[in-house]
Amino acid sequence: MNRFILLLFCLSINQLFAQMINNESGQIFTETPFFNEKYIRSVKLKSITGTISSKKELGSIKISGKKEAYIFNENGNLTIHYLSSKNKNKSDTTFTFYEYNLKNENTIFRVSDSYGFYSYSKKYNDLGKLINKTYSREKNASKSKMNFKLEERYVIFEESYLYEEKDSIIEVTTLNSNGRPYQRQIYYYDSFNYLFKMHTRLLISNSTKQEKYTYNDRGYLKSIQYFINANETPIKELRYDYDEWGNVTFMDEYKDNVRVIHKELLYDPSTLILKTILSQDLVSNLITIIKYKPEFYN
């Protein structure tokens, strides 16, 4: 009886952290870290490395030579993402680095490109709201992209953000490098504090865009629709579905109400660690398969 109670307790604790991917605001597969650090930390996951294959219509599966990896620190934060490829025996790898403060807020987002590195440095207020972002070009003192060491930084521009809250509405004004406002965003929340609409307006041209959010019965993000100006038809839509643990199981992308991409996510049933991503381009019918292998901290 005691063992049964203990098993139920362990299952309930694991269920709290069973969502490997955090898609609360639709950040999955974006540059924003989208892994649940509590889950990553609880299973002591160090990295997942994926081999990428592809299959054309009526063709066989072919190994592309590309690799993708997500690397985490012991606190569960994503620190490195890289994507490597081989073309005519020449390899090329794009690295993305993430740094955090003591509050687990992402303070530096750094990416390698053909010219070196660029970064966004971020500052937050006491409430965790982003108040400043600086874009810079950077020089690497190391010969290795993987082991980046800052030699020089050249600030290109910066933005700052002002917040005003009115009941269930948050208004964010973006200031340019000269301290002048150029953009205003309004976030609308319902009585349960779910974001259901975000409206963006450029102050000079008065052009606008809008995002609408819907949720399923368990409160997980179900869809995001993107609109420009006064158009009533979304130019883009993302739809999601989840398993019983709250893990994203598929993601569909629509353009002008036509589905163009379908992605399925498969998890290891024993650990719920992401195992495979199947992605189909519905225009070309190209299927991409990424199979991940996990590595753990001792």
Q: What are the roles of these predicted feature ranges?
A:
Residues 1-25:
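Bacterial Sec-dependent N-terminal signal peptides
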